[in-house]
Amino acid sequence: MKSVAQTVIEADRFYTIAAHTGNVIQAVEGSKDGGTVRLGKYDHKPEQEWSFVREGDGVYRIRNRASGKLLDLTMTGTANGTWLHLWEDVGGTSQMWKVEHTPEGTVRLRSSWAGGKCVDTVGIGAEVGAVLQIWQEVPGGGDQLWVISEVKDRIKRAAKVEQAAPAAETKAAPAK
């Protein structure tokens, strides 16, 4: 994976979390507890954007913008292959993630609950539709490296849409 600029995580901001393919972590069924989390092509949707709620030194709860639900471990699992899903904030350690920066500017997301296992993809795939799981660290494992990027263009895009919309025509009132 090539080097990328390191993103500083700040409160009250939203971010995408992208695999080496550019596909991002997204909530597929984000409005319900147990909602699926998969990779998808970034379409500027709130289901694909996340905030990081600081819990301690490099430890965060990762909250989905659309639903407010947290990235969590299915059944509070700790084994390799435990899937990730969304769940309401229950204050549990299975919802806490250590953000570990690499020299290349990527990060590993490590479960605070599952002995530091890394967010990974099922089947070593980072294509659209890949399901997320935890797995022990695999040296050189590109599927465990993520790029966190701040979402900056949402306001700019909205302003462009407003500017592009034709102004309403004003007609003079008919003479009486």
Descriptions of predicted regions:
Residues 1-176:
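Lectin-like carbohydrate-binding module/patch detector with strong preference for beta-trefoil
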